[in-house]
Amino acid sequence: MDAEKKSAHFRQISSYKPQLLVLSSIQENPSSKISEKANIKADNDAEIGVFGAEKYFSMKLDHVDSTADITKQHEKENTHDHPNANPNPNPNPHPHPHPQLTKTTSSRSKTSRHGTPSVRSESSCNSQTFLMRINNHNENKQRKMNDTSISFGGFRCYGPCSGVKTVHTDPKNSCKSRNSDRDFVAYDARKHNDKPRLHFEAKKADFHAQEKISLPIQRSDIAMNLERKLSLLTWDAIPNQLSTKNNNHNNNGNNSSMSSNTQEEETASVASSDLFEIENITSSVYEPSEASIGWSVVTGSMADQSVISDFDMMKRVTRNGPVVKTKPVIGEKVRSAGFLSGCKSHKAVSVVDSSRKVKETAKVDHHEMSHQKKFKTEIRIQDLSFL
């Protein structure tokens, strides 16, 4: 049983031997292989330079090629070292029993690109990325411009019209443009200009016809306006409409009718002036009646009475003369048992003076009234004396 286990273990080790050899060879001499590949790549970069960017536009990355070359070289070395070894004596249904080993190899192959890159290689990589961006940007612009088309005349321009390929002609549009040119050459301006001229002539004829109808009325109105302006704004100078019509009618007749027209105008002016004059309509004189005489006597007596009353008022003012100032007499003090004192106020003392003045004025008024009654009776007797 132990011998069988050992043989099985040996078989497994023999099946993984090529992979272990590959890893051991990479670990033992990594710098020599990478340095050789870096020198080869540096020489290629030196030959290409910055301006040989055509290789980079093919969108192929260098690290993929380098990893493929490295794996091929390792396989060749393994075949030279072990020519009689079977790569897979016992095929395993699982092709990758150790995924960690495969991951490490792939990661190392990817990371082991060039070693230490030179300044020229870095500049070439930077120029590569920059030029790739510019190229993609220009391609997008060209696609957008190709989508839009500009048409003018008989040509159609797809995008910017910089090259011959971008210009395309449409035969239909060109035929239309040629036909339109021919129509423009055959265009006759006289036919189209006749319409406005005929329209203007028709309007002119209508205008003359209206003038012929309305000329007599307008002339008479003009004559009336001129005569009014030339006149001095007097009632006699304003012409009558009937007289102006008669004048226009008689201008074609004999000169003998002018005198009759002037007479008619004079009579019309006199009639118009009579409206503003006041005439004496009541020329006859009537005898006065008794009622009118009585009314005149009453009005006259009232007028005389008003005059006499005014005269009496003037006399009264002159008779009175200047006003005499009276001093109030203060009464003696009267002793009383109560708290009341004697009358010391001026109002209580002046009552006697006011009563005296009222009595005097009453006497004067009575005398004047008696005198007026006598005068009225005398006036009435004098008025009735003429009957």
UniProtKB/Swiss-Prot annotation:
Region described as Disordered: spans on this chain: 1-21, 74-128, 242-271
InterPro entries on file: PKS
Alphabetic keyword roster: Phytochrome signaling pathway
GO biological process: phototropism; red, far-red light phototransduction
Coiled-coil blocks: none
Tagged with keyword Ubl conjugation: no
A GO cellular component annotation in the UniProt record: plasmodesma
Biased composition (Basic and acidic residues): 74-83
Composition skew (Polar residues), residue ranges: 12-21, 114-128
Compositional bias per record (Low complexity), positions renumbered to this chain: 242-261
Functional description taken from the UniProt entry: Probably involved in the phytochrome signaling pathway.
Family: Belongs to the PKS family.
Protein name (Swiss-Prot/TrEMBL): Protein PHYTOCHROME KINASE SUBSTRATE 3
